[in-house]
Amino acid sequence: MQMEHRATRLDLDFNFHVSNRSYVSIALLTMPDEVLAKQTLKTVTVHWLHETYLDETLLCRMSRTEDGSYLHTLTNADGVVVCELMSQWQPQPETPDVSEVLNRSL
């Protein structure tokens, strides 16, 4: 999966670069809905390689690795990799039905 993201003022830090938090948020937007619905983020490893500024466009590509992790690669308009992330996900714990919890406490 891939998507484009144009850096806005909301993405910037105090030095007017795209913030570290924004790179992670942008990358995670490429996660499939079925993963987000049934799993939670376990770990994320980030390698920041180049700075990105206001109005620059990033292309974020996501692919699944052999071990089941997800590789997120963000490149700028020149094709330069600006950030790479590896995310690992785990199944969400079972959430009891609210009515069951309420009945147990009565």
Name the predicted role of every residue range.
Residues T52-L54, S63-L106:
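HotDog/MaoC-like acyl-thioester-processing domains
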Residues F14, S19, S25, Y53-D55, ...:
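A broad, structure-centric signal for solvent-exposed, well-ordered loop/edge residues
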Residues M1-T40, E94-L106:
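Hot-dog-fold acyl-thioester-processing enzymes
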Residues E34-L71:
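A conserved acidic, glycine/proline-rich C-terminal tail/linker
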